[in-house]
Each structure stands twice: as structure tokens, then as C-alpha cells.
């Protein structure tokens, strides 16, 4: 019982630290911007939607800090031994499977009538039209999320659910979906979380 409580506490800590870093960095960037340009606090709410450069910068910085903290503390598993074995067939299968979940995720979205909020969708589109935004969304953020949700959270869940890996994978995928904060991303992130969780379980590597 003590072991269960300890593992749950660690998982809770990982989630809190991950979210706290995002919030603190966003407010630090936004606050600094408002002070520098002598803008009223009322502008804070829509600042990230209107200023894509600020959004990209805060996203990159918060992700890099997340990676640094989790690796420095030893909270995440990040072995490259599996990648060194050149498992190209497995990696190719994972890429194909990742592309393959797009159709069922779209189908589920249509079935449950869930859509990403318009402002958020527009923000992502604008970010993807910026080279640094593309790097942030396509490379840095996913790597930070893998460090946290597979390298740290799933690793603890696999210890907690010893002998029941699919329970651990499913729970970590649901947590991954919930953290994204809206129903549309919840479906996509949860399905992707199952795939990436399975890969982590089979390989012991987030890469």
C-alpha cells in the first residue's frame, strides 16, 4: 500500500511540475510584455492569441525548461540504447501507425461532435506558418511531452501496474489527453498516447 501511495504521489508531482512550468513561463512572458509596452492588464487574456511570436517564444522556453528539469532530476527515462540498435522496421511501423490513427480520431471527433475551439485552432495555424512555430510544435513540444508522459509518468505507472502494462498505458494516455484541456485534442492525444505508450513499453525508450 505504501508503494502504491508513493508511485501515485510521484505521478501527481510530475503533472503539477509540468503544468506549473507552462503557467509560470507564460505569465512571465506575458507580464514582461505588458510592462515593457506599458499595456493594461486587461490585454492579458487575448495576448497569446494575438501575438504569435510571444506564444512561440514562451512555448519553446517552457518546453526546454521542462526537459531540463525532468532530466536533471532523473525523473525520466531517456535511454538511447534501443535507438542505437537501429530498429528501423519498428520505427517505420510506428510512423505508419501514427498516421493511421488520424482517420479513427477524425471519426470519433465526428461521432461525438467535438471540435477544437476556433481561437485555439487559428493560433495553431498561425504558429505553423512560422518556421520557429513549426519547430516548437513539431519537435520541441513533443519531445518535452514524451519526457514527461512516457519517460516519467508511464514509467511509474508500469511499476505500479506490474504485470498489467495495458492498464498503465491506457491511464497514461488518458492523462496525456486530459492535460491538453479540450475535447478535440483529448481524443487525438489519447489515441496517440496509447501508441507511444506501447512503443515505450516495448522498447524502454522515448525515441
Locate each region found by the language model:
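Membrane-interface helix caps and helix-loop-helix hairpins in membrane proteins
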Residues: 178-184
Amino acid at each position: 500500500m505504501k508503494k502504491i501511495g508513493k508511485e501515485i504521489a510521484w505521478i501527481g508531482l510530475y503533472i503539477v511540475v509540468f503544468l506549473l512550468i507552462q503557467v509560470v513561463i507564460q505569465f512571465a512572458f506575458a507580464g514582461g510584455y505588458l510592462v515593457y509596452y506599458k499595456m493594461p492588464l486587461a490585454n492579458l487574456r487575448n495576448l497569446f492569441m494575438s501575438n504569435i511570436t510571444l506564444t512561440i517564444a514562451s512555448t519553446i522556453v517552457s518546453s526546454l525548461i521542462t526537459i531540463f528539469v525532468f532530466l536533471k532530476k532523473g525523473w525520466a527515462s531517456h535511454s538511447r540504447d534501443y535507438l542505437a540498435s537501429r530498429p528501423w522496421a519498428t520505427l517505420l511501423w510506428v510512423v505508419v501507425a501514427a498516421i493511421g490513427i488520424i482517420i479513427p480520431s477524425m471519426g470519433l471527433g465526428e461521432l461525438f461532435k467535438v471540435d477544437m475551439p476556433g481561437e485555439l485552432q487559428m493560433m495553431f495555424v498561425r504558429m505553423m506558418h512560422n518556421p520557429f512555430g513549426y519547430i516548437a510544435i513539431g519537435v520541441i513540444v513533443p519531445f518535452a511531452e514524451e519526457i514527461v508522459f512516457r519517460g516519467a509518468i508511464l514509467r511509474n505507472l508500469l511499476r505500479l501496474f506490474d504485470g498489467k502494462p495495458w492498464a498503465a498505458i491506457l491511464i497514461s494516455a488518458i492523462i496525456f489527453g486530459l492535460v491538453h484541456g479540450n475535447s478535440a485534442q483529448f481524443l487525438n492525444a489519447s489515441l496517440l498516447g496509447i501508441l507511444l505508450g506501447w512503443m515505450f513499453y516495448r522498447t524502454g525508450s522515448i525515441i
